[in-house]
UniProtKB/Swiss-Prot annotation:
Belongs to the EPSP synthase family. It catalyses: 3-phosphoshikimate + phosphoenolpyruvate = 5-O-(1-carboxyvinyl)-3-phosphoshikimate + phosphate. PROSITE patterns: EPSP_SYNTHASE_1, EPSP_SYNTHASE_2. It is found in: Cytoplasm. Monomer. Catalyzes the transfer of the enolpyruvyl moiety of phosphoenolpyruvate (PEP) to the 5-hydroxyl of shikimate-3-phosphate (S3P) to produce enolpyruvyl shikimate-3-phosphate and inorganic phosphate. The gene is aroA. It comes from the Bacteria. GO terms for biological process: amino acid biosynthetic process; aromatic amino acid family biosynthetic process; chorismate biosynthetic process. Its EC number is 2.5.1.19. It comes from Geotalea uraniireducens (strain Rf4) (Geobacter uraniireducens). This is 3-phosphoshikimate 1-carboxyvinyltransferase.
């Protein structure tokens, strides 16, 4: 088991670029594989999750060439994938499993999806239910709620589905299945979740229409495109919080994706009093991008809920760290989805922050915590979750003493060079 010990920092300073966006990287492989013609991808995130997606499509006959800088995908068209000869292993990636389940439901072959011990215990019925309404045949453990999942490809029919949860994975699985369905497929959700699938489908030429509260798609061949993947705001979030909570810090993070469905982290931290400027705003491959200038700030506790939650769902572990260093009480609500991530992120952060001296009260769908003047040194657990591990390492920068995080191998899931980048900007 790998461990890493972080010491308190004097400041966080410099200029960095974070790795490519994980969500966009997944989708570039999927859509590039089922489009006609060649797709090139610059800035692809070579983390374990994205490599699981890449390897799955290679196993279905897609030629993906990687020269270390650019991926070149020779698309097969909607009906061109081949039946895999082995189980498709999604590793720790819920995005890979849920989105591929939707895509595979419309194929004319049999496939099986599995993952690691954590992924095999995450809920899948939220995807299987709407796909079954479209005519998909999918089997899984626990009545279809747990992987491995066996997908028997067949003809699909478009549906109108009101998702009870705001989940980009659920929405995207249905939209991908909708590419293969007869008629129109429509999805609505309580609050708008990240819209990378809609943007990229439109960029690839899909017959897609967005409207207030939802999206519609009809089957049509896609055309390969050139994609430049922006920096992942979920990865940038760790460095944003680091620069905010360590006095004397100033950090420029270049080329970050600032899709409005993902900038909840900026809105939350700004509402807490954080100094975050968006510079050099532009659009690349259908996605808004900016450079972020972050300066150390005195943060104050706030209430977080409603439509902010799906716009910052992956950033809540490090938001909890920011709240722990803020003056006063922070209340997080409407975030029950955090309990079914790679681990129960509400419980995991509560355990770790209590070790660091924070007064934390868990609720069913969130938590309440009171910030402290300085976190205490401690030994924290990652619980096998990359975002928990990185969040607690950021906490260590603002602690009185060292924070050691156990089981840090999981960081490679989404951010293989996190430690190296952190060491580059921390002034000890």
């Amino acid at each position: 088991m790998q461990t890493y010990t972080i010491k308190p920092a004097q400041s966080v300073r410099g200029e960095i670029a974070v790795p490519g966006d994980k969500s966009i990287s997944h989708r570039s492989i999927m859509l590039g594989s089922i489009a006609r013609g060649t797709t090139t991808v610059c800035g692809f995130l070579r983390g374990e999750d994205n490599m699981a997606t890449l390897n799955a499509f290679r196993a279905m006959g897609v030629d993906v060439r990687d020269d270390g800088e650019t991926l070149r995908i020779e698309g097969k068209g909607l009906a061109g994938l081949s039946e895999p000869t082995d189980v498709l292993d999604c590793g720790n990636s819920g995005t890979s499993m849920r989105l591929m389940t939707g895509l595979l439901a419309g194929q004319r072959f049999f496939s099986v999806l599995t993952g690691d011990q954590y992924l095999r215990n995450r809920p899948m019925k939220r995807v299987l239910e709407p796909l079954s309404r479209m005519g998909a045949t999918i089997f899984g453990r626990a009545g279809g709620d747990k992987a491995p999942l066996a997908v028997v490809g067949r003809g699909l029919t478009g549906v109108t589905y009101a998702s009870p949860v705001s989940s980009a994975q659920v929405k995207s699985a249905i939209l991908l299945a909708g590419l293969y369905a007869d008629g129109e497929t429509e999805v609505t959700e309580p609050h708008l979740s990240r819209d990378h699938s809609e943007r990229m489908l439109r960029y690839f030429g899909a017959d897609i229409e967005t409207f207030a509260g939802g999206v519609k798609v009809r089957g049509r061949e896609l055309t390969g495109r050139d994609i430049t993947v922006p920096g992942d705001i979920s990865s940038a979030a760790f460095f944003i919080v680091a620069a905010l909570i360590v006095p004397g810090s100033e950090l420029l993070i270049k080329g970050v994706g600032v899709n409005p469905t993902r900038t909840g982290i900026i809105d939350i931290l700004t509402a807490m009093g954080g100094s975050i400027e968006l510079l050099n705003c532009r659009e690349i491959s259908g996605e808004p991008v900016a450079d972020l200038l972050v300066r150390a700030s005195e943060l104050k506790g706030i209430e977080i809920g409603g439509d902010l939650v799906p716009r910052a769902i992956d950033e809540f572990p490090v938001i909890c760290v920011a709240a722990s260093c803020a003056e006063g009480r922070t209340v997080i609500r409407d975030a029950r989805e955090l309990r079914v991530k790679e681990t129960d992120r509400i419980a995991a952060m509560a355990v770790n922050l209590r070790k660091a001296g924070v007064d934390v009260v868990e609720t069913e769908n969130g938590m309440e915590l009171i910030g402290v003047e300085r976190l205490e040194g401690c030994t924290a657990e990652s619980f096998g979750d990359h975002r928990i591990a990185m969040s607690m390492l950021i906490a260590g920068l603002a602690a009185r003493g060292e924070i050691t995080v156990n089981d840090t191998e999981c960081i490679a899931t989404s951010f293989p060079n996190f430690i190296a980048l952190l060491e580059k900007v921390v002034v000890p």
